[in-house]
Amino acid sequence: MPVVSLAQMMESGVHFGHQTRRWNPKMSPYIYTSRNGVHIIDLVQTAQLMDNAYNYMRSHAEQGKKFLFVGTKRQAAGIIAQEASRCGSHYINQRWLGGMLTNWATIKTRVDRLKDLERREETGALDLLPKKEASMLRREMTKLQKYLGGIKTMRKVPDIVVIVDQRREYNAVQECQKLNIPIVSMLDTNCDPDVVDIPIPANDDAIRSIKLIVGKLADAIYEGRHGQLDAEDDYEDYDGSEYDDDYEETEYTDAVIPDEETEE
């Protein structure tokens, strides 16, 4: 029995690609046809490749491998956070900071700073400081939580990275390639399948499509670590309203956390 059925994928809109004028010719093998100027993804291939991805994730989870989920677009942010947390994995769902993996030693110092501030908040140590200083430290903590909260327990670079929207997360892709970290990625019709290791042709813009694919990948990790799921989870719908779509084609080479004022 396939991990995802054709009916599930049709219902979730997994088959809808981009407008034909916005395609990447390298995705041609995964495209079934076009309708009204929109490419339609071949769901038979998606089902087969999803089985491959599921088995790959489950097998590596059984071996104790660590996973990082990456998806910073508004539609994906909430799903990435919940599904990664559910299966005990790390995630980035706001902005990818340059050097997140290739300069992990520097990033880890910021993660350690976050944990220190949270500890001081929990113990009441911040309340003992002058009001202005405590306020500044709390603002710093909030900013660090926004960008690094999903990797707070990550001790080293991940073994496998799962990506939603390979084009958007190109900086993450490049860092994975430099470090030879395998990439499992949803690929819409405007993506490049050559830069990922485990492709999953699918609509990476629709919330229901993202939820279906990412949810199944999280299932694979969970089952690899804890055994077969007892029942299918009823995943909450997301509208993405709590996440800002503030992506910029900017690389923060010094792993600097961007100021809130500069995000608009």
From Swiss-Prot:
Keywords tagged on the record: Ribonucleoprotein, Ribosomal protein
GO biological process terms held by the UniProt record: translation
One Pfam family, short name: Ribosomal_S2
Metal-binding recorded as keyword: no
Region (Disordered): 228-264
One MF annotation (Gene Ontology) recorded for this entry: structural constituent of ribosome
GO cellular component, one term: cytosolic small ribosomal subunit
Biased composition (Acidic residues): 230-264
Cysteines joined through disulfide linkages: none
CDD domains on file: RPS2 (cd01425)
Keyword Ribonucleoprotein in record: yes
PANTHER family in UniProt: 30S RIBOSOMAL PROTEIN S2 PROKARYOTIC AND ORGANELLAR, SMALL RIBOSOMAL SUBUNIT PROTEIN US2M
HAMAP family: Ribosomal_uS2_B
Recorded family membership: Belongs to the universal ribosomal protein uS2 family.
Protein name in the entry: Small ribosomal subunit protein uS2
Organism: Nostoc punctiforme (strain ATCC 29133 / PCC 73102)
